[in-house]
């Protein structure tokens, strides 16, 4: 089991911001990444739909022999993490908790901005995190409609991207925020543009490195780390990717965002007799 892959999934390419940190933290681990680009973004979808698709993707990852799963999507973590843990109690399943706690520790003004999707803000996980760690600060919630789509399209910089970002940033700046939480895995791909627009005095919190460290700790505790004598794996044997949309489009995004050249597998959505979704290779 220790040599089995780690599964990661997101609605699209955003989870690659988590994937690249796992690559650095765990160089001997094989990884299987699934992008549900047929339904990207998850942020405006219903909780029932997000849960159903997350469950089907997890079923696929388990069938592929994954020893652990990372829900590399803030929206899916907010809505589907606990149902997935109940469905697979034998499997370590990690999600993304909004990085409110470190932001509260960093702020000097007492005002923290959070950039996320509507579904993340409405989720119990986010509300519980804010209630636990942020009662002594003001939290400014900024819904970033369309930002995940910009990242999916590869629009990571330029005047149009800057104008869109400033539309999200200005309400937080006006409220006095000096710390901003990136509450969607797509957003780290525009972190340099955000930092340039807000200036060096603003702290921008990307939770991805902490997620990778936590995954390493969990695997070590459960005895699931790949054998140390294996050493770092070659990319061709280490990385597997699958998408529910166009493999060629995903491959281009993969090269653009994380500098990896690979051929992804196409997956298709079908329905079981009870109308629940299921994933199959195309």
Regions found by a protein language model. Name each.
Residues 1-282:
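Non-catalytic structural scaffold of enzyme domains
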